[in-house]
Amino acid sequence: MNPQLLRVTNRIIERSRETRSAYLARIEQAKTSTVHRSQLACGNLAHGFAACQPEDKASLKSMLRNNIAIITSYNDMLSAHQPYEHYPEIIRKALHEANAVGQVAGGVPAMCDGVTQGQDGMELSLLSREVIAMSAAVGLSHNMFDGALFLGVCDKIVPGLTMAALSFGHLPAVFVPSGPMASGLPNKEKVRIRQLYAEGKVDRMALLESEAASYHAPGTCTFYGTANTNQMVVEFMGMQLPGSSFVHPDSPLRDALTAAAARQVTRMTGNGNEWMPIGKMIDEKVVVNGIVALLATGGSTNHTMHLVAMARAAGIQINWDDFSDLSDVVPLMARLYPNGPADINHFQAAGGVPVLVRELLKAGLLHEDVNTVAGFGLSRYTLEPWLNNGELDWREGAEKSLDSNVIASFEQPFSHHGGTKVLSGNLGRAVMKTSAVPVENQVIEAPAVVFESQHDVMPAFEAGLLDRDCVVVVRHQGPKANGMPELHKLMPPLGVLLDRCFKIALVTDGRLSGASGKVPSAIHVTPEAYDGGLLAKVRDGDIIRVNGQTGELTLLVDEAELAAREPHIPDLSASRVGTGRELFSALREKLSGAEQGATCITF
């Protein structure tokens, strides 16, 4: 095993000793003291199966068969979640064949960040993770179930569902993906059209045609954003079946994997022979494997918050130092857009998760001795699923990458440093997705241009006010200020400025999409401006140093002058009403800082 990996793992174990012990005691108590449906009052039980088919009613009355909860995030708004419409039918059929029953226990909201990008609704996005966790818990609270299947793929949905699953950690759980859409317009061409539109060189219809050719079918978007990072991370964590992440929707193999997930969760229940509740399955080693997956693939920076919140739900305490120290030894081994031209389908064709797991295991950069939904040992995830005469089976995946431009070997990685860098300095702490930023753009020292809203940046760009070396500061975008929206709309104009050979960087306490690209961006700055962060004292013209290589984020202003400055705190009341934002006020006020997971749920 890599010594650094062991050191980080051991310090997480030590740091989490009390909280993890308390969590395990809690789920053990839940296992023994939670009222099972066999102890429900007759009226409770009758309500629970009133809408079931006669055969299922008889099974639930007898108490001899497993009842599996289905928590679904189906809606028609998310291309990745539309395939879930018919999953309950597939699952119920598979469960019947396994002498079990399946009930849709509840639905959770699922927001498409692609639809709300740059809109008021984006200010609900991060908060929706907490709502998803709570909504799933409502479904599971009926105490009718022996296990659960979680149907979710996209940005906040998988982290929220994980938090809920761990709150019911005495139950086994399997996550069930939907898979990516087929490749459409190449991502590089899509970005080219976006930048031309930002410069006024193509019209809205040309832009719309480009976007519609990129996002064109059911399934996840094919770039390597937060949705596909979710799938990568949870497969490395053993939360879904081996090789199941990136199989296309509506294919025979996808349907077979969905049915197999249903059968597998029945084996993991107290009535089966492989009892493994999710709260015991997800331990410190599993969490470290998830971080390694993120770093080795240059995944979404959103997971520097999501993984923290997910781990906390299991009583495990991680922080950005853990990400940073692992990033020093975990190389970048995948090049997927925005880190390169390939998409997630190219990744799958190059050997996918099995190749990457195999390489990292050989290098001693993953814990093999972990429990997974497929059984003990992460080496199971070097297998790939296939249909053998119409029957699902697993075989050894590729021994090495089938396309070295997409998946590199450990010996010849794309970079010897992981795809995420933690920055620190007097401005606070932040993260940068370095995997997508050319080395020559990772260091900048330039005057600040300060904005209080992302919507003010484009007019300044159009007026030529940013045609110079500068650090664009967009503040009061943190969790407590306005829910920490993604600021991906800033990328086209800032990308144009880079192409004009200006030295440009972004510094913000907000988020960027998992598809954040070539602009060096110090994001998730904590403490946020609204909550006492020095970012609130930055003024136009102040020199800021951003160094994605050494990990520096410094405001080069005399300390005495900074101490004398008053922080600028704008009136944000107008941004807290409308589009339902007023309903989330109580949650927003309780959100922790980005490094603490930006969560309002205490575990």
Curated annotation (Swiss-Prot):
User: According to the UniProt entry, how is activity regulated?
Assistant: Sensitive to oxidants such as superoxide or hydrogen peroxide.
Q: What class of enzyme is it?
A: lyase
Cofactors needed by this protein, per the record, are: [4Fe-4S] cluster
| Amino-acid positions noted as binding [4Fe-4S] cluster in the UniProt annotation, renumbered to this chain | C154, C221
Q: What induces it?
A: By growth on gluconate.
Q: Which reaction does it catalyse?
A: 6-phospho-D-gluconate = 2-dehydro-3-deoxy-6-phospho-D-gluconate + H2O
Q: How is the cofactor bound?
A: Binds 1 [4Fe-4S] cluster.
A GO BP entry: D-gluconate metabolic process
- Keyword Ligase in the entry? The reply is no
One example of the protein's molecular function in GO is: 4 iron, 4 sulfur cluster binding
What are the alphabetically sorted keywords of the record? 4Fe-4S, Carbohydrate metabolism, Gluconate utilization, Iron, Iron-sulfur, Lyase, Metal-binding
Q: What happens when the gene is disrupted?
A: The mutant grows at normal rates on glucose and fructose, whereas on gluconate it grows about one-third as fast as the wild-type.
Which pathway does UniProt place it in? Carbohydrate metabolism; Entner-Doudoroff pathway
Please provide one cellular component term from the Gene Ontology annotations of this protein: cytosol
UniProt keyword Ion transport, yes or no: no
EC number(s) on file: 4.2.1.12
Which function does this protein serve?
A: Catalyzes the dehydration of 6-phospho-D-gluconate to 2-dehydro-3-deoxy-6-phospho-D-gluconate.
Which family would the database say this protein is a member of?
Belongs to the IlvD/Edd family.
Name by which UniProt lists this protein: Phosphogluconate dehydratase
The taxonomy runs: Bacteria, Pseudomonadati, Pseudomonadota, Gammaproteobacteria, Enterobacterales
